[in-house]
């Protein structure tokens, strides 16, 4: 893998982490500010947070594996 490809992967990992952090913040805000009235929002926000965190974890693992292979 070229240094440019590794750099692009690292950038993707950072973007995925930022998105996961934003989703976690949305979940936190729901818990802190809008529950119990907005309880119906829990499944959608929780799923979006889970998906974003999983995407980050997969991107991070792929980047680390590619980095170790070089």
For each feature predicted by the language model, list its residue ranges.
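Short, charge-rich amphipathic interface segments used for partner binding and complex assembly
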Residues: 29-68
């Amino acid at each position: 893998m070229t240094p440019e490809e590794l750099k692009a992967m690292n950038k993707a990992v950072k973007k995925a982490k930022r998105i996961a952090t934003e989703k976690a913040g949305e979940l936190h805000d729901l818990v802190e500010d809008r529950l119990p009235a907005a309880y119906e929002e829990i499944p959608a926000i929780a799923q979006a947070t889970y998906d974003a965190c999983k995407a980050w974890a997969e991107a991070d693992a792929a980047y680390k594996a590619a980095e170790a292979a070089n």
